[in-house]
Amino acid sequence: MSILEILYYPDKRLRTIADPVVAVSDDTNQIINDMFDTMYFKKGIGLAATQVNIHQQIIVIDLYKKNKQRLVFINPSITKKTGIISIPESCLSIPQIYEIVPRSEKITIQSLDQYGNKFEMEANNLLAICIQHEVDHLFGKLFIDHLSPLKIKKIHKKIKKLSKTFKKNQFPL
């Protein structure tokens, strides 16, 4: 079990556009396992490699947080979006901040699995939201980027206030 260090907003590395994975290898699978370990340790439901300073197009998701439905997406591409759903979102890279973000209610995604096999799947509701959130990370986008400038300003103030209650290495600014 290896817990990776999470990058915290406003770390500029979160804005890095991830490179596609050229070939799925044992190293790729070690990254995936470490990402799941990190996500479970931090009590998240999704994690993009960018959030742990690995700039490859890899996403892990488990909505149940208990190793029950481990999903891996390598080089994901959302090919279809329908409907709109808005629920509060949060992020392991922006702890304790929750904001309502409009997302597509249903999506179709094409990807590689952890073995390098191509697949396509449909997702809706929470899974669709989580996939969209994590895919955004791969392109340097955060959930707060979907908010108004006024809300972002309020979040910055809240983060500064929260950062005083965290140790510097847990939530650096």
Curated annotation (Swiss-Prot):
Catalytic activity: N-terminal N-formyl-L-methionyl-[peptide] + H2O = N-terminal L-methionyl-[peptide] + formate
MF (Gene Ontology): metal ion binding; peptide deformylase activity
GO terms classed as biological process: co-translational protein modification; translation
Annotated EC: 3.5.1.88
Keywords: Hydrolase, Iron, Metal-binding, Protein biosynthesis
Cofactor: Fe(2+)
Record-annotated active site: 134
SUPFAM superfamilies per record: Peptide deformylase
Co-factor note (free text): Binds 1 Fe(2+) ion.
Coiled-coil features, chain-numbered ranges: none
Protein family according to the UniProt entry: Belongs to the polypeptide deformylase family.
Function: Removes the formyl group from the N-terminal Met of newly synthesized proteins. Requires at least a dipeptide for an efficient rate of reaction. N-terminal L-methionine is a prerequisite for activity but the enzyme has broad specificity at other positions.
Entry protein name: Peptide deformylase
Higher taxonomy: Bacteria, Pseudomonadati, Pseudomonadota, Gammaproteobacteria, Enterobacterales
